């Protein structure tokens, strides 16, 4: 079985206007891997959920994607201003809605490097708010899931 996620592209894939963006494979156990360009994104379920815990779960990668996206904006801001990023880090914690089990709030704390100019505190937060992953949560895409038979 193979799940294929597609996005619109100017390139043709199998005679259509859609191109495969990534392919998902099932290497065994509860592991699920995504092949994206020249990279493999490995996932597994925690031991408590029957997996081996050998890689982050898809949901952990989702949260990591949000934080690293904010991080690249913070990094780019500092690089653009010539500000050292030594000692800079982001920590994230989440608040869950106990009725739904879904996240109700994501909190990120940017630890600024020593000597970070006070006048740029708000600006670096504003740059992190531009994160594309976050924007997709605010305006979610339509999901279209289909099936085909493997040959």
Predicted regions and their residues:
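Intrinsically disordered, low-complexity Ser/Thr/Pro-rich tracts
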Residues: 3-4, 129
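N-terminal cationic amphipathic segment used for targeting or macromolecule association
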Residues: 4-5, 41
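Extended beta-strand/beta-hairpin segments
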Residues: 12-64, 72-151
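Alpha-helical metal-binding/catalytic segments enriched in His/Glu/Asp
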Residues: 69
């Amino acid at each position: 079985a193979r799940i294929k996620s597609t996005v619109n592209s100017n390139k043709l894939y199998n005679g259509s206007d859609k191109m495969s963006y990534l392919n998902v494979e099932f290497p065994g156990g509860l592991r699920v891997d995504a092949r994206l360009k020249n990279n493999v994104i490995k996932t597994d379920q925690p031991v408590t959920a029957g997996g081996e815990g050998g890689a982050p779960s898809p949901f952990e990668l989702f949260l990591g994607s949000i934080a690293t996206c904010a991080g690249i904006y913070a990094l780019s801001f500092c690089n653009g201003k010539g500000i050292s990023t030594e000692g800079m880090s982001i920590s994230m914690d989440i608040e869950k809605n106990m009725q739904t089990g879904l996240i109700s709030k994501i909190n990120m704390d940017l630890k600024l490097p020593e000597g970070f100019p006070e006048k740029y505190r708000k600006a670096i937060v504003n740059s992190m708010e531009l994160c594309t992953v976050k924007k997709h949560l605010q305006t979610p895409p339509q999901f279209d899931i289909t099936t085909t038979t493997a040959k």
